[in-house]
Amino acid sequence: MMAFWKIFFKHHNIFSSNLNNQLVNQDAADKILLVKYLEGRGTIVNVYLSFNSYVNLHDLEKLCDSVGWVRRPLKKVKIAIDNSFVTASLFYEQNKKKFLIGFARATSDTSFNATIWDVVIHPDFQGQGLGKMLMAQIIKQLRYEDINTITLFADPQVVNFYKHLGFITDPDGVKGMFWYPL
């Protein structure tokens, strides 16, 4: 597993944001300027990062709809978020209203392992480094908590995105196994 971290940190320079040398206090992180003057939706916006676990579920559902994800029951989504170890949101503000443009969360045993879930960036804002910055902040929080094994599940079309961040398929060749009710 140490080989993974050597590869991961070899690629650390892809994470460029004004938070690179700071660790964010999750409890106090309601609104942190992440990117100034980003172009999106035909306008220039400031993008903010929040580690506040409160997320408007309808806004999150719209964000997930924008990338074609299957809808999930909002009650279960709320439970999943409430039971997450780390949540992070990206948004911009316009006319005193927040617009959710990115989200990710991680679950953990709080000791050894964490899994990153639900990484999503609105299509109007993809390709500008926001996904990389969001992942960098989630990983930074997990590493601060001394989590050594970070996993995620990725659809085939985004595997290369995660590979560019230093994630690798299991070096031991172990395949994940799943159980679903029939």
UniProtKB/Swiss-Prot annotation:
Alphabetically sorted, this entry's keywords are: Acyltransferase, Chloroplast, Plastid, Transferase
What Enzyme Commission number(s) does the record list for this chain? 2.3.1.-
Going by the entry's taxonomy, the superkingdom of the source organism is recorded as Eukaryota
Predominantly, its location class is plastid
Q: Where in the cell is it found?
A: Plastid, Chloroplast
One cellular component term from this protein's GO annotations in UniProt: chloroplast
Q: Which GO terms describe its molecular function?
A: N-acetyltransferase activity
Record-linked InterPro entries: Acyl_CoA_acyltransferase, GNAT_dom, NSI-like
The UniProt record lists the N-acetyltransferase domain at 55-182
Enzyme class comes to: transferase
Similarity-based family: Belongs to the acetyltransferase family. Ycf52 subfamily.
PANTHER family recorded for this chain?
A: ACYL-COA N-ACYLTRANSFERASE (PTHR43626), GCN5-RELATED N-ACETYLTRANSFERASE 2, CHLOROPLASTIC (PTHR43626:SF4)
What protein does this entry describe? Uncharacterized N-acetyltransferase ycf52
Say which species the protein is native to.
Gracilaria tenuistipitata var. liui (Red alga)
Give the encoding gene's name: ycf52
